């Protein structure tokens, strides 16, 4: 399948550079995955579309301040490091810039030597393996020295780093935020619970795949970078109970979707407690096994994320919705507006 089938025209001014002042004031496009019908709403209207007995699945990963500015110890040359994945102990898979300056044995110093890293080898597709040394607690030092790893299309400085975290972020380990969750406030989640909507939590640590465009000409040639996921017995039991009682499972974001679909694929359609690494790649032709609806942001042209949404809601429906979003001047990408995708039969207000 040609990658260009997932292209669309996006004016640069529609790429949201900063978060809205209030999380829940973003807009919400409601897309019927079967008919392609569209409604234009506000995010707080999600209350009208989720019913008693439904379950929202939220990714409680927490973004690390994973971007570090350092210098080579021998020359003083500036090096930028992006932490991607903890491999074991103090060894990490990273992206470094400029990569050509970092070879095996190179030592990089951060914060006047408070944190040091030695390159121990190369990683996939141009990355570097670094081993860190320090006195104290690594994540406390990272919190002091690191910057939030905003995507390259965001040029503005983030004034409040909490705005690139969900309000329920808990398990540190991501190199990017699960952005569909950024729209929820604690008050909105409480209103959903009062309505009888269940909240279930999983973890998927967002890694390298988020920053890597599809370089292949056809979808089938592209390989996803593996990301760590975890679902507890408690969450699995809740999801199975919801399904047995006829409720819908609505994933918040592509990361929650990938977690549930990975587990269902690996366990004959069943949802159970599981941990591991997933490189699942969903594009048109994929048959969904676990979810009934999806809340997601508006994604980049030709990205694996728009392919996932197209697998769930039909490519023609999704591209029509995206063109409508451009026409209506929705805000795109990480700090942008949201889309709720589900089937018409259960879409309306109750």
UniProtKB/Swiss-Prot annotation:
GO terms for biological process: queuosine biosynthetic process; tRNA wobble guanine modification. InterPro entries: QueA, QueA_dom1, QueA_dom2, QueA_sf. It is found in: Cytoplasm. Its main location: cytoplasm. One of its GO terms (cellular component) is cytoplasm. GO terms for molecular function: S-adenosylmethionine:tRNA ribosyltransferase-isomerase activity. It comes from the Bacteria. Its EC number is 2.4.99.17. Keywords: Cytoplasm, Queuosine biosynthesis, S-adenosyl-L-methionine, Transferase. Pathway: tRNA modification; tRNA-queuosine biosynthesis. SUPFAM superfamilies: QueA-like. It catalyses: 7-aminomethyl-7-carbaguanosine(34) in tRNA + S-adenosyl-L-methionine = epoxyqueuosine(34) in tRNA + adenine + L-methionine + 2 H(+). HAMAP family: QueA. NCBIfam families: PRK00147.1, queA. Belongs to the QueA family. Transfers and isomerizes the ribose moiety from AdoMet to the 7-aminomethyl group of 7-deazaguanine (preQ1-tRNA) to give epoxyqueuosine (oQ-tRNA). Monomer. This is S-adenosylmethionine:tRNA ribosyltransferase-isomerase. It comes from Bacillus cereus (strain ZK / E33L). The lineage of its organism: Bacteria, Bacillati, Bacillota, Bacilli, Bacillales.
